[in-house]
């Protein structure tokens, strides 16, 4: 990664632990549309209890980190314009289901619209929300193209990475899973 600035879209059970871990090595902007959630995080309070207070406070920064080499930290915001300098976007919004157990894609579509507004040539978008096979290409990519005016696999790139955590599981955290993976696959 050449001067990455990572955006995490959705700071819930999946997004916040990932943002905290990445912020130990990279500049990270954590975006959540809920102002109350962001305000609590800015104080170092995680109401989901997924991230320990001391670990969260170690990486929090009160200002949006710049792309200066070596700068790290997590800036939490509910202002979409704070995503403008990011070049990697990881979408971790929830995908609830309706009463018939069909996925409600509204959060995913809204997140794709937000990302599309700030997408630039060469950027990478990774979806980590739980979705059915083909959803990324069928639902998300067209929104990114329409909003950004860019062309998928030509101007920007998209990937899918399934969730790597089990909310509430303090033993199998993102950091522990990555550590074990790197030890097994150097």
Which role fits each region the language model picked out?
Residues 130-131, 141-143, 166-186:
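Short beta-strand and adjoining strand-loop segment in the mid-core
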Residues 11-12:
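Glycine-rich Rossmann-fold phosphate-binding loop(s) that bind the pyrophosphate
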Residues 15-16:
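N-terminal Rossmann-fold NAD(P) dinucleotide-binding loop
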Residues 81-83, 118, 173:
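Structural alpha-helical scaffold elements that stabilize or flank donor/cofactor-binding regions
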Residues 2-4, 27, 33-88, 94-102, ...:
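Conserved N-terminal Rossmann-fold NAD(P) cofactor-binding segment
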Residues 97-164:
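Rossmann-like NAD(P)(H) cofactor-binding subdomain of soluble oxidoreductases
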Residues 22:
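Aromatic pocket-lining residues of Rossmann-like dinucleotide-binding sites
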